[in-house]
């Protein structure tokens, strides 16, 4: 399936081994590609991510259900199916409340929003019109953003969907039906939301299961532009299906560093240490109180899975792990995200996925000192019991 488009419808870092009285491995964020210029720091790299009618505004598109749709300035629209109703939520509901005087400047209607005075409204055709209300739709807002290849970026935004309308006593959305709220990015700068290069995050919860949902994804740019997609896929025909988007943001991602070391005196004790940075953008968010939270994990091929050392660890730290094997490679990684602790900072809070730092480290066995057999005694070989061998 191909999206239709037009103006309105348009290292892993391997560580360097250091050997002095201890062995050490170190990983840090990747550097921008040669010849690139670091991007200018800004609190939000998206244009019109709050969808405010009285700020960045909207432009008109084609007629749907008797009137021209409204599309946020700075964004294009792509659709797999027939276009649904798209509008400024503020203007739509103000005009529904007062067709003569209602508009962007009035405040007489309830508007579903999270940030500012407005949000972006997406609504199925024939919302409550028999005999086939709530036509399926699959539509995305699309914006290209200047990036630097090799630099990680993080997207975070909010959506809410209403399958079966907003009535909740009870809500009648059939079991198995859903509206997929999706936030994605193509790190190659491609414009096709159906391409395999797009990295997606998705949430299918209805409004009565958590209301507004935060969607977030982190990606390393592979080109001079990255394409952002804010999408709602409503694949089932059901009455009342509609959704809202608000508070969409993109920043240069937070970064992490990680080291691993062991001493000759105790080579099976590996100390893992980590640190990181919010990056140049997040610190510019007005009234923000963002901190770094880490997940620290390690891997050995005999495990087959990553094992956790720390979860939601606040700030820089260290952890000493007892390894069971020497002269064999372990991998350690630090996964970082930036968010605000409960009750702090600016609303709505965003959660920014950071670039993962990963290293490989091989704790070395101490050198064996040569021994001499006792005079006149043959030497013996002792084989240890397999069950007594430590787990790697």
Explain the meaning of each model-derived region:
Residues 268-288:
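Conserved aromatic anchor
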Residues 285-307:
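Extracellular low-complexity, O-glycosylation-prone stalks/linkers
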Residues 323-343:
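Beta-strand-rich modules
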Residues 309-316:
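Short beta-strand segments within Ig-like beta-sandwich modules, predominantly Fibronectin type-III
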